[in-house]
Amino acid sequence: MAYGTTLSQRATSLLDTVAPKGGLVTAAAAAVLGSALLAVSAKVQVPFWPVPMTMQSMVVILLGMAYGSRLATATVLLYLLEGLAGLPVFAGAGAGPAYMAGPTAGYLLGFVLAAGVTGWLAERGWDRSPAKAVAALALGHALLFVPGVAWLAVLFGAEKAIAVGLTPFLAATVLKTALGAAIMQAAWTVVTRRSRV
């Protein structure tokens, strides 16, 4: 099925289109690659105003769009397990259980929610329409911020949580949403052209 047009229909994911006969090995390789991309995207900082940005949130939601809900969620959970085990996969130097229960805990939960929901929307064809892709990626970013800011509010109060955990990242989020939608449209254009050859 090329497009999912109702909530019960499932469209083929970008990964399934590229590797239609992929099985468990393909899924495992994709999960490992995705968790590596998350780790790299956490470490690379891009100068931006008012604060430098990483591309990690965009990678989370693009994994959802490209992999579909189940594999994207599994990929993000693998990434979090790597961090829980103490591997240096997060933006800072910290890792392990104490780090994951700290101020970033809500955002880490948000990664799982964002990947799962954007993947679910992609399975219904939202990754193929520019407007729907923007909407799906914006929703993915919102799902990332809601638990992140909520947990910061528990730790530091609502006003400080919004001031340090949301407001400085809004401009970068708009940019990453637009860039992510453009990447998905370009990826589908390339895949569609190759399938016609």
Locate predicted features.
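Peri-membrane helix termini and adjoining interfacial loops of integral membrane proteins
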Residues: 2-11, 84-89, 157-160
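Hydrophobic transmembrane alpha-helices
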Residues: 2-73
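Alpha-helical membrane-inserting segments
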Residues: 37, 41, 45, 63, ...
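Alpha-helical membrane segments and adjacent membrane-interface helices in multi-pass membrane proteins
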Residues: 42-116
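Juxtamembrane/transmembrane-helix boundary motifs in multi-pass membrane proteins
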Residues: 18-22, 26, 48, 90, ...
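Membrane-embedded alpha-helical hairpins and interfacial helices in multi-pass inner-membrane proteins
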Residues: 125-197
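Short helix-perturbing small/polar motifs within transmembrane alpha-helices
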Residues: 3-19, 26, 33, 40, ...
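Hydrophobic alpha-helical transmembrane segments
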Residues: 28-32, 58-62, 72-78, 104-109, ...
